[in-house]
UniProtKB/Swiss-Prot annotation:
Gene3D superfamilies: 1.10.10.2420, Glutaminyl-tRNA synthetase, non-specific RNA binding region part 1, domain 1, HUPs, Ribosomal Protein L25, Chain P
GO cellular component, one term: cytosol
Tissue specificity field: Detected in dorsal root ganglia (at protein level). Detected in dorsal root ganglia.
Identification of the protein by name: Glutamine--tRNA ligase
Subcellular location: Cytoplasm, Cytosol; Cytoplasm
Gene from which this protein is expressed: Qars1
E.C. code: 6.1.1.18
Induction: Down-regulated after peripheral nerve injury.
Reactions catalysed: tRNA(Gln) + L-glutamine + ATP = L-glutaminyl-tRNA(Gln) + AMP + diphosphate
Amino acid sequence: MATPDSLALFTGLGLSENKARETLKNAALSTQLREAATQAQQTLGSTIDKATGTLLYGLASRLRDTRRLSFLVGYIANKKIHTELQLSAALEYVRSHPLDPIDTKDFEQECGVGVVVTPEQIEEAVEATINRHRPQLLVERYRFSMGLLMGEARAALRWADGKMIKNEVDMQVLHLLGPKMEADLEKKPKVAKARLEETDRKTAKDVVENGEVAGQTLSLMEQLRGEALKFHKPGENYKTPGYVTTPHTMDLLKQHLEITGGQVRTRFPPEPNGILHIGHAKAINFNFGYAKANNGICFLRFDDTNPEKEEAKFFTAIYDMVTWLGYTPYKVTYASDYFDQLYAWAVELIRRGQAYVCHQRGEELKGHNPLPSPWRDRPIEESLLLFEAMRKGKFAEGEATLRMKLVMEDGKMDPVAYRVKYTPHHRTGDKWCIYPTYDYTHCLCDSIEHITHSLCTKEFQARRSSYFWLCNALDVYCPVQWEYGRLNLHYAVVSKRKILQLVAAGAVRDWDDPRLFTLTALRRRGFPPEAINNFCARVGVTVAQTTMEPHLLEACVRDVLNDTAPRAMAVLEPLQVVITNFPAPKPLDIRVPNFPADETKGFHQVPFASTVFIERTDFKEESEPGYKRLAWGQPVGLRHTGYVIELQHVVRGSSGCVECLEVTCRRADAGEKPKAFIHWVSQPLVCEIRLYERLFQHKNPEDPVEVPGGFLSDLNPASLQVIKGALVDCSVALAKPFDKFQFERLGYFSVDPDSHQGQVVFNRTVTLKEDPGKV
């Protein structure tokens, strides 16, 4: 019999011509639907009714395991599956039972095959449901949620036809309440809802000091919204699209559940060859956060398989950053913990004919279409002997590798599993001269630790096939790898290589230079870990790569520091002010609230003497429209003192520059209120203040179109300003590195580790308000 025209075949199933043409554009779907329709015609003849056609289309578009197509089409064609509800149950059943053979008796029971629900049963179930809600129905009448009645009746009669249930509900409600009256047609008042929404908005966003709005801090599960909520349950790995099953899968999953007790297990697996950056913060939050949200555990596993690039300081710094962000690893492990097991598995892989020793050089393997290895089909015994020779150091670096026999998604053929490296390892010393690659190590370490959800950034998607293949080739437990989009920031570079170039060029001091977006740099600048976590939460977890503006991160920083950084006063460009009629023979102690908006958080004292210092920019000899601070004829208040000062005399130096102001003071409540109150210091400490701006001038400094000269040509010459002679009040005298303050009217500042006795150094973390020019 000739194969009918596909368009005619699809329209014969009840699809519109447009829908049929659209389906034909999808090769996989059209192939599957064609097979389903052709098989159904063998049972039903050339004419297929629309209801059956709809089920066949639903099957073809939703079935992931094509091995089950013929089995399910048979049930549809023979009218054993005749409702959408049954089809959904059937699809869920085959997804949950990936291995042959299918228990047909169990399958039919779970899918309602042969179950007949009579009109009388529907009538009785609906009547029982209505009786349960009768009092409320009589009060609310047609405003009552009919969906609730439908849902309860459906639950009582799982395989009943939905339309029949709805018709019965409508009929019995009409019989109980009678026809709708005018009052039933009125919409429910929305006053309560509007008030609730207003309350929610006030709860979510509080107006805070300096006119800013504090953003809502997202909960852990809100952070894990989107794709992450579709994750499989532990032990149900096979329900994940694309997961590869073997005859051993279900037994291995059973053993896995016995070991883990159904516990969620994740891991954060950094390479110890550099410092973590803001993108890693998302990975840390996702891995640790997902485990925590599900009462699970998260490993910190160092992928230490590149001994020549690893340094002890990176291990320490990575652990410090994970704990600084507020997470405690269940266990700290190393890929090197498993070197013996990994080697034994490599030998087993060769024995199974799935790996071979190759002598192609690294340069021969590069490019899009490298030549196939002439050693791919060498005898197993020969590869075993050569691999042992590699382990014993009988090959020079680059002379031999162990390669796996598979083709990856990106077309890369036979990835390398082991290579020769004559570099002592920081943990194993000179025990090994062969080291496993990421492609070989990653999935097997996940398997050893019984990771349930292996969460990776999107660039590792091309390695998913090798992940599943390797675990299955060795018949070991196979976790699920799930990829999500990286988090990037504009005006930043985070590549280890490029940061080293910045350091070498003198553009930054080191990995922790506050202008960088490494986590050590952000900590040094004064970014609280809670702010970084909140930022990651707001970004969320999606498959798409995300590039964010730095000002969004800075907004999260302000939200946290506004509530946690006590206030102090500092003057960047000091101008001396002498109060000629100071009201006391000695300095007064001024009580200043640590947090003006919440005085329950305590106070600190600062001295107020006859000589104070104000910002030079807070004085102008001639006032101008809009200017409210100190000028001739325009007094100004001194914050927290209760006093107002008025200019009497300007003292100039030999160059004509203003050196000192002589003023008189009065109580603020003894006359007209001044237009402004300014900050000041008296008997202050001298300090160094470092003001930071963006390191790069363009959004995408690595883009050759935007920055043709390369990222080093895009440096902002004004990214750092050092003020040596700044003054700060004595309340910060005992501050330690990383202590944070809000300097009133100036911004948030953090004590730098460069501070020493007698010289405090402050880094400006962020300004008080976002600079509109930065958006």
